[in-house]
Amino acid sequence: MDAKVREPFSFSPSGEKVATGRMRGRPPGHQTPTVLVSRRRCDIPPRRYDTQHMRELVIGIDSGTQSTKALVVDAKNGRVLGEGAKAYGLIDGLPAGAKEQHPADWIDATESSIRAALRQAKATAAEVRAIGVSGQQHGFVPLDKKGQVIRPAKLWCDTSTADECDAIMAKLGGLKGAVKELGNAVLPGFTAGKILWLKKHEPKNFKRLATVLLPHDYLNYWLTGNAVMEYGDASGTALLNVRTRKWSKKTLKAIDAGLEAKLPKLISSDQSAGTLQASTAKRLGLSTGVVVSAGGGDNMMGAIGTGNTSPGVVTASFGTSGTIYACAGKPVVDPKGEIAAFCDSTNRWLPLLCTMNVTVATELIRRDFKWTHSQYESAARKAPVGSDGLMLLPYLEGERTPNVPDGTGVYFGVRAKTFTEKHFARATMEGVTMGMNYGLRRLKKLGIKPTQIRATGGGSQSKLWRQIMADVFNAQVVTLKVGEGAAYGAALQALWSLRNNQGDRVGIEEITNRFVRLNKRETTEPNAENVSIYQDVQDLQSKLSTSLRSSFQLHRKLINEDNCF
């Protein structure tokens, strides 16, 4: 049965009027989304300014899986002047492996976050000059010809499309053929499989499909009325040849003969998506002249926000998912398809590993033991390095690196000695970090040699966890003055786009070198003894992952098809 979207949009409470219009840059018949325009302007406190000394502000938005954050940044010095955030969740009651959200929730959270950040910054509308958007990668937002959302978005963490990915890979000639055609394997979680899934499982909805967007593209569409996609986020669709930065016609044909007509215009990272359209500007209390940058996926924006804009820098993001990536001057293609050969959002490339289960695992432990974050860390400190042999395979809802789409979480080594809160607390931190190190080992084999890793995300705020990172990765770990790497990166890209629009042809690295600052007080060095212990544990974890794959498949069949649980 075709899924139905809850509603096309739900931007605000009742008492509002509707504004519609044709999507600029699209053929007749394509419409901008139905935008509910509030009668109330955003409550930004009035300020009097000498226009010669008016501040120049940019906004960075990070629309993630669990929440949306907004930062107001001073374009002169890079300082964060205001912050806002709003949380939301996944749709409940879906089959195992399916992960979906209502795009309307992103819009609502974006508006709320921007308003809060503007209030904190005491900003006037005239001061805000540009907006940049970071969004969770790979999600599939299907629009009809009127620009309305057809169904909920399937997300990056959705592993229900494994069969569709296998079918596309087969038409491309298997792994070898896919890597040759795209530079990447077609993995569950990537967008390509989701489109074929819609065609196969919801044919009526597929027939309505007019435009394919990613989450950050959809927010840009709401902001500007333009449907565009920049190269960095597009490279995560498994539809783009990362070497040529062009759509792969062979891959598109493997999904549907008419798919290319449904894809938006590709733009480079230094181009703008447009300017704020009137209806959205009115909702936010901002000017229609505000520049909206190309934006990008959260990893691409995280690279900018951590200063990872020139070869030699490596970033590790410890959020809901985990990613490690490096800036490269040319494509770094993995013949095994385990490392993603993405484009970045600076017109370079971003070899990247992604694990799907990081803070999602530690937060489950914290919740179940009813701990605060400090209580969690205190408990984990009481267990020794290696947790006395208790190990976690953190594949709670499948995994991408290594590619275990049917995986589930496994605690291995449970004994009377290790059946304690402290052991489970530390083993979970160690397990998700070693899950990321599986991919880092592969990156090293492809020529990426990190001596310093810039850590960002919620996990990087823990002193103990930073030490575990340094010991598992065997590299120095540093943090950033601004911890919200993706939102800050979106703000800096917005500034880059603004300067380009003003005729100042500056490089993004000039901006990041000026504004991105390391928190040197939190520099963490690896402990040689701990490094040795973790290398042995890592080897066993990798071996377990391989040996359990057939069992994972049987287990997924048990819980999905046999309806036993």
Predicted regions and their residues:
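N-terminal glycine/serine-rich phosphate-binding loop of ATP-dependent small-molecule kinases
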Residues: 31, 35-36, 42-44, 49-151, ...
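Aromatic (phenylalanine/tyrosine) cluster motif
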Residues: 9-11, 49
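Active-site core segments that coordinate phosphate-bearing ligands/cofactors
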Residues: 59-61, 162, 169-185, 189-190, ...
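Short beta-strand-loop/turn "lid" adjacent to the catalytic site in phosphate-handling enzymes
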Residues: 119-157, 184-189, 220-241, 265-270
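Short, low-complexity, charge-dense intrinsically disordered segments
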Residues: 1-7, 42
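Glycine-biased, low-complexity coil/linker segments
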Residues: 16-17
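A generic structural motif
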Residues: 79, 86-87, 156, 339, ...
